[in-house]
């Protein structure tokens, strides 16, 4: 039974905050062509309220089925169809309230509407906690006979089969009801983390080397590390932000310990040997996928050393630390205006066929992209799909190279949603996070290829080469380092140890050295960064999927580029489009294998390390010509 895509809601709750850019327009000053059209979802709040009430009514119909599921296939069919109705409504209700909230985080009325939605569905989860235990009381062989003999049940075969696969980790009805009471308690650590790291965080004023006043926030820190060329200013900004963490390091450690302890308690209650085992089991991912990733990524240490030593040399820096790792080697001032980038992104996806290209182009015309920053708007970017309506993309576009790649990235997600929803019934339309980032990073690679065709200066080429390198470091190396740290921290909690700030900092320092060697000094403020990663507190063992997805998209892209014939290339592209159209109709590992990527073997991740080495060699050669 697919009830609601809670992963989508979780993503929407992560990383809320206001942008650090100055001179931001108010919402009314942004042209309508660059704003979401909410009438695509509902004509009014009255219509939204009516559907929210309808959810309660449908929920009561489902509750009335309690105790009747064993009567036959028609009862199962009724349950699944009613669940689909609630799920489809949930997407629309979430979209109308959540998306509007995200464009004005200071609007208390919108926050209240969002809370109304969340409250209704949390209550619904408790009322329907009996469903899985009752379904599992029916012998699996009987259920399969019912599905075989009832054509309308065929579309539910995979999700129902999944329920039986996981049955050893499902409690009886009373146990599931008891756990549902603690579901909100399990989110308390992440709520406290959001409060201390974002809601209660105050800007920290400093004076830069040129006398300019600067307010340090999480957002302005990220911007400064990638754009500010004065080393002393970057270091001051990093030290200022890090000091705010150091001052509360024991609080952050206590929150993280509570989050991990809560996850471990539920994993034990559900008969898992570890939190990692429980997280992998949800997608039926073999343990070797995780361990292969960690073992392989560490092999990039020497390449990372070469890259950062090159940066230090070209930039002429006597000392080198974390605050020197991210800003570009060359000061390329190329602008990427939104209107100029639109046709280039559309052109870049031509290899995927005219139908894909036309569908992507339509996303620019239908009020589905909220382009520019405005006062009160959530920072960052995402693509959020609403079944039956389509994807909605949030951006904070400022004409920078990173903004252009972010647009390509989010449109990759959006097209994944479009194709899955168009080709799958609601029950299997929801693709897993394990494959989600394949589509987004693949489209970034296509866009990069388009930009490389247009390079006119050595500086532009170096900027694009470095973008590729930083992309691999950020998406593959860093996320694997994060996952490695998580594994070590969870292992300590699961062995009975209480996490302290000193212990976490030690683990972070040791793990960083395993990937970066001596590039980052042991006393660098970066060593407290374990307190700054929201995913650690909100979604354990989430980040490794970024790395495996990157490896998967790289493997598919390379296969297309090196195909020996047009026929072979067409076959690879067709397998890839089939992956994008398959939603959640199979295990993600099997979906990727059908597309030509086997993550149970190390080849895909090893190829990323080789790609990084090749790019660093190209960058070394390009810099030698400056």
Segments from the language model and where they lie:
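Active-site recognition of the HExxH zinc-binding catalytic motif
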Residues: 271, 398-418, 440, 445, ...
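C-terminal, non-catalytic "cap/extension" segments appended to globular domains
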Residues: 28-30, 39-43, 135-138, 158-170, ...
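A well-structured
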Residues: 20-331, 342, 622-624
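Hydrophobic h-region of N-terminal signal peptides that target proteins for export
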Residues: 12-19
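Catalytic zinc-binding patch centered on the HExxH motif and its immediate surroundings
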Residues: 334-336, 369-389
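Bacterial N-terminal signal peptides that target proteins for export
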Residues: 1-8
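Short pre-active-site segment immediately N-terminal to the catalytic Zn-binding motif
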Residues: 334-338, 386-408
């Amino acid at each position: 039974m697919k009830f609601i895509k809670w992963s989508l809601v979780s993503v929407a709750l992560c990383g809320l905050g206001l942008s650090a850019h100055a001179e931001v327009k108010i919402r009314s000053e942004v042209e309508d062509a660059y704003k979401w059209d909410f009438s695509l979802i509902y004509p009014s709040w009255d219509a939204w309220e009516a559907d929210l009430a309808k959810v309660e009514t449908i929920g009561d119909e489902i509750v009335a089925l309690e105790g009747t599921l064993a009567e036959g296939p028609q009862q199962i069919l009724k349950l699944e169809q009613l669940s689909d109705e609630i799920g489809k409504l949930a997407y629309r209700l979430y979209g109308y309230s959540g998306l509007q909230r995200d464009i004005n985080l200071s609007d208390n009325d919108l926050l209240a509407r969002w809370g109304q939605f969340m409250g209704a569905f949390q209550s619904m989860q408790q009322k329907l906690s009996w469903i899985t235990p009752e379904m599992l009381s029916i012998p699996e062989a009987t259920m399969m006979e019912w599905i075989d003999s009832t054509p309308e049940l065929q579309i539910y075969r995979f999700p129902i089969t999944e329920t039986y696969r996981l049955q050893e980790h499902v409690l009886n009805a009373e146990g599931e009801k008891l756990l549902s009471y603690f579901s909100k308690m399990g989110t308390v650590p992440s709520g406290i983390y959001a409060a201390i790291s974002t809601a209660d965080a105050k800007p920290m004023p400093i004076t830069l080397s040129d006398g300019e006043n600067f307010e340090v926030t999480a957002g302005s820190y990220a911007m400064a590390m990638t754009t500010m060329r004065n080393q002393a200013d970057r270091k001051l900004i990093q030290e200022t932000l890090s000091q705010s963490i150091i001052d509360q390091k024991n609080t952050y450690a206590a929150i993280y310990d509570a989050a991990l302890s809560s996850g471990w308690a539920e994993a034990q209650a559900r008969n898992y040997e570890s939190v990692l085992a429980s997280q992998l089991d949800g997608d039926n991912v073999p343990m070797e996928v995780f361990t292969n990733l960690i073992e392989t990524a560490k092999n990039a240490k020497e390449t990372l050393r070469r890259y950062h030593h090159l940066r230090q040399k070209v930039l002429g820096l006597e000392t080198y630390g974390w605050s020197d790792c991210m800003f570009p080697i060359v000061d390329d001032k190329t602008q990427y205006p939104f209107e100029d980038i639109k046709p280039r992104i559309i052109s870049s996806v031509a290899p995927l066929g005219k139908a894909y290209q036309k569908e992507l182009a339509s996303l620019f015309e239908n009020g589905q992209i909220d382009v520019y920053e405005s006062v009160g708007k959530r920072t960052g970017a995402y693509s959020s799909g609403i079944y039956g309506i389509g994807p909605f993309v949030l951006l904070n576009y400022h004409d920078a190279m990173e903004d252009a790649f972010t647009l390509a990235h989010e449109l990759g997600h959006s097209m994944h949603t479009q194709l899955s929803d168009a080709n799958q019934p609601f029950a299997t339309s929801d693709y897993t996070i394990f494959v989600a980032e394949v589509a987004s990073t693949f489209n970034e690679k296509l866009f990069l290829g388009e930009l490389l065709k247009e390079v006119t200066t050595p500086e532009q080429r170096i900027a694009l080469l470095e973008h590729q390198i930083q992309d691999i470091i950020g998406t593959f190396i860093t996320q694997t380092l994060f996952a490695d740290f998580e594994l070590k921290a969870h292992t300590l909690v699961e062995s009975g140890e209480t996490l302290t700030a000193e212990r976490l900092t030690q683990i972070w320092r040791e793990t960083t050295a395993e990937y970066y060697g001596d590039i980052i000094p042991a006393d660098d403020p970066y060593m407290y960064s374990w307190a700054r990663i929201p995913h650690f507190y909100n979604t354990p063992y989430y980040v490794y999927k970024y790395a495996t997805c990157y490896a998967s998209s790289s493997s598919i892209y390379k296969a297309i580029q090196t195909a020996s014939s047009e026929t072979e290339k067409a076959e690879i592209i067709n397998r890839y489009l089939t992956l994008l159209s398959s939603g959640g109709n199979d295990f993600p590992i099997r979906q990727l294998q059908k597309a030509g990527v086997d993550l149970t073997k190390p080849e895909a991740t090893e190829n990323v390390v080789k790609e990084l080495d090749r790019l660093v060699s190209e960058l070394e050669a390009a810099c030698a010509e400056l």
